[in-house]
């Protein structure tokens, strides 16, 4: 078929008549759209740099254009101005079939589909043609699903997971050209205020509730159907307003900040993830350094707050604010509110110490320190640093997007690659089993460890992430992430389905090890259906290609792969017994 396609390219040439007048046409240049709406820093960056670079005219920029960015930083949220319009088909919402589950938003790799909760007044001001429903569980509110067609990549993950009603989905895929005029509906949705009572009703750390929080990772350049970005996006919805991210070089750094476009953004208060990238293998140490720097600054501020609280000149209001901040010093969930109260109480006071505290208010609240990277970094070239950070005992979170291969560099084998998988440096199928990074981390006894696979268990994913962040020590999350390098025969629109199959067949296991919990180890996966194991392997080109090239070797390695999966699950069930019998 491939040869026939090549031959058709030569024999199927069609002559296109070009008008004679084109010979004398003048070059009118590109039609640049001048951006005016948004934060001044990002608007200036988009107009002066991003637009030119995206048009491949970056070489024409003078050095003076970069004077505001000499420290290497760039404004958050510039990806929202690209509006690439690259999808062939985009999701269309049929409100009659919607059960308001928010699954579509939860799995969207690019944050282009979002639920909106509107008051009656907001709904009355909605653009013409905006469909909406009475909101379930929230009388007086209207509910809508909004879609940014111009930012969509057309992967279809949302439509794939949509449960719909009576076999009829609420989301179907249709031609982009027929829905480009609906962009104002999405744009309106971004102006609607975030409803604290709605988030409180459905809870921010649940599948449904989390999606009423603005994603602070939006419109990245990740592949259509990417398995990594849904995890990162969810983390920003849970903790993005107080996040620091150290990002290892790899896919997550490329979709995380491909110059000049920055998909990490801010909320209505101007708060969002502070992101940086370490070029080499020292990302864990890099993130650890961020944490130590924060701790040093906050410890100094803590001493000054204690001095203010102990002062005889301090009012009762000031003392109460200081006490609340000190009491919540180590709680990320509570310290932010206490910080706002402290700053409000100290502002305007003519006191050098108070002025110093207010001047450094950005450092007062406890931050959520994350270290992002892929398996090539965490299992291989950066493993020493990962181990060092986990051993430190410090309150820090490591998120590993586990694609079981070096994704960004083209699919090289890593220590996460499983037996029989074909990858660069393992063209004949990898002969050795996957490194058990989770067990290595659990051996410390004081590290929170979780394995998650979003498509297999939406609730377990958000629960594990919330538990890891709340745990007052090091945490490690290994997230199964389907990748284009896997060659999923069903296509990347079925990435969430593949995550589900991986767990159902025992290829991947979901579990949580929480040293702070009474029940330390929880195996969240049911007993696998091993009958479908070989079909799962053959459903991905990384395995199926070996079966085509060398069936005998494939049969041997695939059998070994399956045996290792059985052994792995049996080991996990023993951990359930071991920790379940603790006094």
Predicted feature locations:
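Alpha-helix capping and helix-loop boundary segments enriched in small/acidic/polar residues
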Residues: 96-99, 135, 146-153, 207, ...
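Short conserved micro-motifs at the rims of enzyme active sites and ligand-binding pockets
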Residues: 158, 257-258, 488-490, 556-558
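Conserved active-site loop/cleft motifs that coordinate metal ions or position small ligands
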Residues: 476-478, 545-547, 556-557
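Glycine/tryptophan-enriched, flexible segments
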Residues: 533, 549, 553-559, 565
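Residues within alpha-helical segments
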Residues: 3-6, 10, 442, 465, ...
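Short acidic DE-rich linear segments
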Residues: 582-583
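Glycine-rich ThDP/TPP pyrophosphate-binding loop and its adjacent helix/strand module
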Residues: 351, 365-371, 380-396, 401-527
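Ferredoxin-type iron-sulfur electron-transfer modules and their immediate structural context
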Residues: 2-152, 159-244, 248-369, 421, ...
